[in-house]
Amino acid sequence: MSRFIPLSIPNFEGNERKYVDDAIDQGWVSTGGAYITKLEEQMAGFLHVEKVAACQSGTSALHLSLLECNVQPGDMVIVPTLTFIAAVNPVHYQFAEPVFMDCDDSLCMDPVKLRKFCEKECHVEQKQLIHTASGKKIKAVIVVHVFGNLADMESIMDIAEEYHLKVIE
């Protein structure tokens, strides 16, 4: 007997096929077209920001986010221990160093351990979190919501504000 346990189950409830067919008919199935523009406009409105940029993958979105956070070679970025490599690769693209943070029972980053790391292994100099042992700047924390479980963003955002970290979600 063969049993298959899916990693995730697609959830299609509306006009997805209609929209995909329409995009194909218009010849826009990648980086442009009306649907991309509409997505960017709706996301900007939802987020209350002037502009957003749709990306072709989560990896490229994370890479652009690290650039926006001014992550430089030699900097550090906190990442969860349980994630796909695509969440860590962009850190290496910037020649930065990932700092792996353990997860809690939700399988997402543990804010208790994040706070303990910031308190015990780091210090703040001129509104910049510094890893005490290495002297390296910690510029950001990448939060990944795993398998439909939501990370405790309220706690993580509080920690990030206190320790001057940018949050990439």
Walk through the language-model features, giving the residues of each.
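Conserved coil-to-alpha-helix start sites within the AMP-binding
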Residues: 83-88
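Active-site phosphate-binding strand-loop segment of PLP-dependent enzymes
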Residues: 106-169
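Phosphate-binding glycine-rich loop
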Residues: 29-76, 90-94, 100, 123-133
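Short beta->alpha connector loops at strand-helix junctions that form conserved
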Residues: 81, 100-104
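N-terminal "arm"/small-domain region of PLP-dependent enzymes with the aminotransferase-like
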Residues: 1-29
